[in-house]
Amino acid sequence: MRRLPGLFPCTGVGSLPHLDPGPAVREVVSRFPEIPYWPQLPRRTPLEHMYPQYAATLPGAWISGGKLSMRSGEELLPEAEVFYELFLSGDLSPFAIPPERAAGLAGLLSAAAGPFPAVKGQVTGPVSFGLMVCDREKKPVFYDPVGRDVLVKYLLRVAQWQAAQLTRLSETVVLVIDEPYLASMGSAIVSLPGEEVIAVLDEIFEGLPGTVCGIHCCANTDWGLVLSSKTRYLSFDAYEYADSLLLYAEDVAAFFARGGVLAFGVVPTAAEAIARETAETLADRMETILDKLSARGIPRDDIVGSAVITPACGLGTLPEGTAERALRLCEGLSSLLRARYGRRSP
């Protein structure tokens, strides 16, 4: 797989609180020149929330009262037939994310000079999408075979379209699927066999062979299950949940052995923590995490050589100034860790 640039490069997770995509994109590119990402801007419009944002041409979908729903079963079949014909054609243009639903993506593509060493995008994952979006009977569409299959294949095409757009900025594209519902796996809320979860995740990953594909989950989950997928990039909340990953040291070691990238979300997303922390305190926290992983038998060089620095999650609910401080903390932490390890990115 493609290697990401430099040592401890930094990038973002997704959302920013800005209303204007121009300043948001400029902030991202200035702070993360090695791996810029397109910022989601949910305060601009409800259409930039994590489910409607990717549903512009989703078969059987409608929005009522600000809520996205989707037809399922026999009711979906006529639209599903049309969709499958379009899917098999290989044409990606019908799956474009319109600028009104992704102003940050449009802004990055039009304003960023590039080329960059790498560039990152994101899409809501099929598990979370399918469990959050319901049909007329208020049943999550993931539990309907027709709805699930259409949804997974639709999101695959959206991801492929996005990756194709981002190659205009870099040969190395990181495409991360956001899966908050993985934190509910095994609970009374979500009763899904693990193999079904992995099957839909891998359908996305297998359809993006030239892309560094990944998963973001900003809470605790069954990391062994997640790492059994074909993900090449794991983004997690290392500020709050780093110790949970220690329980899966063998899985993490195997992930590194196959060239995986671990994105440490070690910069907090709570306003009070952002105000309190500094690059120095976060570097010490990161060193503690590295010590613990090394103590579990994972070579420190493997971790350091594959680490990316990010915020723990999106920053869209924060004041602009606080979110921008979090980005500066990522930038400062990245620089400090490079200095500590005596190397600089090329």
Residue ranges of each PLM-predicted region?
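Alpha/beta catalytic barrel-like cores
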Residues: M1-D144, S228, G260, T278, ...
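Short, flexible coil/linker segments at or flanking structured domains
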Residues: L4, P9, R26, G214, ...
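Soluble or luminal CAZymes and related metallo-dependent hydrolases
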Residues: D20, E100, G104, G147, ...
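Short amphipathic alpha-helices and their capping/turn segments at secondary-structure boundaries
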Residues: V25, R101-P117, L155-E171, A249-F255, ...
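Noncatalytic linker/hinge segments flanking ATPase motor cores
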Residues: Y54-L58, L76-F87, V158-R168, V212-W223, ...
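Active-site loop segments of alpha/beta catalytic cores
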Residues: G121, P140-E250, V261-F264, P268, ...
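Glycine-rich beta-strand-to-loop/alpha-helix junction loops that act as flexible
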Residues: T124, D178-P180, T310-C313
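Catalytic-face loop-and-helix region of soluble metabolic enzyme cores
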Residues: R232-R343
